[in-house]
């Protein structure tokens, strides 16, 4: 840990002893740190809302799928729409967690090359990744627009540091942006997991997982 952070944050009593009168188990310093974290995530992803983190990136992606599942339109629920598309260049661990969570909800996960994806009304959502697991950067702005016109909800897994240089998914029109906060230089914590970030739009503020 850099000395300046150790002195001014980790060793600063104002960060870890200023207890709030209404919630004695959490310090004001932690609340401020979480607010700063959420503000950075919101700014980097170009999304209006970010939660206080989740377990890891794969968990965040699966939570996005479940949020979409519970946010289907009445017409989609009535029609029994249960397909969720995942691009095959998404991290394999993310795909595995999504499949596991989907199985017990009755969601049908389709994993394939995005080039083969024929977006139709039988899908309630889609997950793509940029940069993908191979480091390739693809701007999905046109695709996102087309998918949403067909009633699909769109999640994008992304890399925080890359968003300092490339167009953030929020500007594409994505509904959710997820990823790993380890890119900020967080320590390994005995091999992981790393904090997963989750950012979304105002429309999902009552559905988003975790703490706001």
Regions found by a protein language model. Give the residues of each.
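Short loop-beta-helix segment that forms the pyridoxal 5′-phosphate
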Residues: 22-26, 30, 43-63
